[in-house]
């Protein structure tokens, strides 16, 4: 296949290009470096940085198969596990998302990092704020800092690293609302309330897919034939935000299945590959 890779930003790598710059995550850059090197060896791949495409541009591109991998963004309304609707008090206290911090927009003074994601991002951003001179309190409804990292045997090291950085850790505690003078915290078990004074809050909640382009293309499906388009597929974080490994697998899977016809129709839960099923038979 002849491939065109259009990147909306100035550099390739997606979220890895940003997250590799966070404390302790520089090694993750190898995920990006390896693939960029491999792509650079192939004459049939054209790369276009700084090329955010709209529906019209995609239709005019002239490619038969369109893979939309537009990623996701961190929610700014606090919706995650504790809050299924927007957190009360938004706008009363300066609030930041992980995207803000990775773009260089940092809080100052007393900062509460509210981690309702429970993977690695909350702990990493708490350390980042502490290194920037903030007085940091990490609040999480979980019983452990960066709870998911117990699966990778990193949780203890993360807790120790945060404690050594001067981060105050508050476990089993959520944030029920934002106030002008800080956050209203609540016990995950008793719902007892107290105020943690702060000048800003970093909301590490859930992520929302950047799928506007995909839905715009689907709405113009009647124009696909004239544009020479056979298939349009949404993959990676744009389809369902998840770990970097899942996004990497999604790209690999898309390429593997491109010749199978699976993208040309909705296969539902049908497997796109054959497998041998052993059963007992009467001789």
Task: For each feature predicted by the language model, list its residue ranges.
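Rossmann-like dinucleotide/flavin-binding elements
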Residues: 1-12, 47-60, 66-150, 189-200, ...
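Generic beta-strand structural signal
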Residues: 177-178, 234
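SH3/SH3-like beta-barrel fold
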Residues: 183-187
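N-terminal Rossmann-like dinucleotide/flavin-binding domain of flavoprotein oxidoreductases
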Residues: 14-64, 149-176, 182
